[in-house]
Structures are given as structure tokens and as C-alpha cells.
Swiss-Prot record:
Belongs to the T4likevirus antiholin family. The gene is rI. It comes from the Viruses. This is Antiholin. One of its GO terms (biological process) is killing of cells of another organism. GO terms for molecular function: DNA binding; molecular function inhibitor activity. Its main location: host cell. One of its GO terms (cellular component) is host cell plasma membrane. Residues 1-24 form the signal peptide.
């Protein structure tokens, strides 16, 4: 009986060791792109809501996916530009206006 339990634990341990590790798909350039858009434009939206946040995120994600940036500097610049474009396209009033 002890031999069965030992074999079972050994098999379980081996399956954990041999199973592929799960990695999060993290793109640091996308993070810079989004942070820049949020900091420079989204925070100035007069009316913020869950719906407006989701729409903004969807626009930014799609824009980035279609034409990703390749350096932190480029991502910061383009993130702010795309967020400004979104505000213009959607006729969103900013606090500075």
C-alpha cells in the first residue's frame, strides 16, 4: 500500500515537472502605449464611466494590434497621439477645453 502511494506521488510530481509552464502574454510596449494614452488624454475626459473605459481600451488595443510600436519612446508618443485621435473622433470633451 505504501508503495502505491509513493508511486502515485512520484507520478504526480513528475507530471508537474514535465508540464509546460504557463506564461502571461505581456507586452511592455503595449503597456507604455496605454499608459501614455491614459495619462495624457483619458484622465482629462469630463465624463468617465466603465463603458467609456472599455471603448477607449478597445480602440487603443485595436490600434496597437494593427500597428505595434517597437520602442518605449515611440510607444509613449503614439499612445498619446492615438488617445487624442480617439477623443476627437468620438467628440469627447476634455477638462482643459
Amino acid at each position: 500500500m505504501a508503495l502505491k502511494a509513493t508511486a502515485l506521488f512520484a507520478m504526480l510530481g513528475l507530471s508537474f515537472v514535465l508540464s509546460p509552464s504557463i506564461e502571461a502574454n505581456v507586452d511592455p510596449h503595449f503597456d507604455k502605449f496605454m499608459e501614455s494614452g491614459i495619462r495624457h488624454v483619458y484622465m482629462l475626459f469630463e465624463n468617465k464611466s466603465v463603458e467609456s473605459s472599455e471603448q477607449f481600451y478597445s480602440f487603443m488595443r485595436t490600434t496597437y494590434k494593427n500597428d505595434p510600436c517597437s520602442s518605449d519612446f515611440e510607444c509613449i508618443e503614439r499612445g498619446a497621439e492615438m488617445a487624442q485621435s480617439y477623443a476627437r473622433i468620438m467628440n469627447i470633451k476634455l477638462e482643459t477645453e
